[in-house]
Amino acid sequence: MVIHLGDHWDMPSLSSYDKGKKSYEGRRYKADVDAGNEGMEMLLSRVKRMKNRPRMVFLKGNHEDRITRLIESDPYLEGAVGFQDLNLDAWEVHDFLEPVEIDGVHYAHYWINPLTGRPISGSIDNMLRTIGFSFTQGHRQGLWAGRRELNNGKAQRGLVAGSYYQHHEKYLGPQGNFHWRGLLVCHEVHDGDYNLMEVDMPFLRRRFGPQS
């Protein structure tokens, strides 16, 4: 099984935060879509050669959801732009913030405080206590992993991993780009618990990148 936690398409052309800034100049919707589709083709190239393809789950992130907000603010664009532009045919797609439960672990792009609508944040221990069940999310750069042993003999897992890329983010500045980046493999997933294996970007480059 492969689970993509979202924000594959960055969609900077639809960013409401950067409009009017010099850095916004030259951004185009089509360029954003094409970049994400090209990356998706690269991601799926090995999977498509497999005889027995795994279940593949894609959770829309807040960056993909910029398309939804665009159509809501400018309804005349409906049909001209939309999620049909994104190369998601190979995936079981779930809407932004829609929870998906698999083997006792609940997945979403991020988890919100139901009273405020804001993302639950803080330390992984705080998130475990606040959310109350085994969860995995993306959204935040870096890696946070936690485990609570419960009095009923079960365990609660918390996992936050929202960075799978090689570039630096300008908005994070010169001191904010040292976060962990990579993918995670969860073995023996059952009843909300699992054995966790971290696979960081430097390892992936050495193992699968061009050989000099």
For the regions a language model picked out, list residue spans one by one.
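Conserved beta-sheet core of the metallophosphoesterase superfamily
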Residues: 106-203
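A generic local structural motif
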Residues: 45, 93-95, 120-125
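Alpha-helical hydrophobic/aromatic positions enriched in membrane-embedded helices and signal peptides
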Residues: 53, 101, 130-131
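Short, acidic/polar N-cap/turn motifs at the starts of alpha helices
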Residues: 95-99, 183
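General small-molecule cofactor/ligand-binding pocket signal
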Residues: 57, 89-96, 108, 159, ...
